[in-house]
Amino acid sequence: MKLPEIESFDLSQKRVLVRADLDVDLKENYRLKAILPTINYLIERGANILLLGHKGRPQGKDSLLSLRGVCGELANLLNKNINFIEEFPTMPPEGDLVMLENLRFNPQEESNGQEFAQALANLGEFYVNEDFAVSHRVHASIVGLPKLLPHAAGFRFRQEVENLAKVLTNPRKPVVVIIGGVKEDKITYIASFEKFADKILIGGRLPEFIQNNLNQKEIIATLLPDKEDITIHSIENFEEEIAKAGTIILTGPVGKFEEEGHRMGTKRVFEAIAKNQEAFKVAGGGDTVKAINLLNIAQSFDWISVGGGASLEFLAKGTLPGIEALN
């Protein structure tokens, strides 16, 4: 899948709007680090950068969901000053590195309001999408804005698409998908995954929401009585399938790994993935990444996506609204 590249444009002295992944926990700043190559590239090319992003799901303005703290952390990572703009500007703000306050403080961001998209476009001359994690949303800064300005995908955005696309295009067989976590809506993706997966291993709280096997490809874990982890028998079944896999997609822990007493399932399943050195291994989702880091096995994965829902949506549909907007 070919996306427009920032290297193809002369952006010197241009006002570049960067839709950045700023919805981060400051204790887990790996997602901020992921956008640094794009920002540094634009700085080196002499662009004037206006960073756009969101945090949480505010209902109007909410000081607890301000991006000011994120601005400070990103400034430290870049070792540069970032001018933080609290009120939405009517004119392009001065400075070569600027961040606007949480876009979701304006309800038109999430409703994809044309007026808001135009107001954003008036602040710049070029648009870069460097927020893969929210590109499954039809929001003004994701799909409205690139219709109004010349545009390209950021480096991380392109890497996300390239690596996730490998799973859909001639993957090494067999393909094993592990779905865990607590979000019931993940079940809706199973039918789509059946199109390319050979086995789908279902853990976490999801077995509670499945009445019976939908397909022979699925192995549904049995939960312990407290429902906080999967049984030893289920762990062994998962380990057996993982050992045979040529491609592994991991989305969600299989138990409440944050508590040591409920960590065995996640530990053994994740370590089984790490031990399979022949497979192409992809992981995604906030809790998945936390568990990977806790177990210190990040180096065993070929790709760790910054997208949770966006990764699932891409694997299910092969595209996202944010990708379509760039094309």
What is each PLM-predicted segment?
Residues 1-327:
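Active-site loop-to-helix "anion-binding N-cap" substructures in soluble metabolic enzymes
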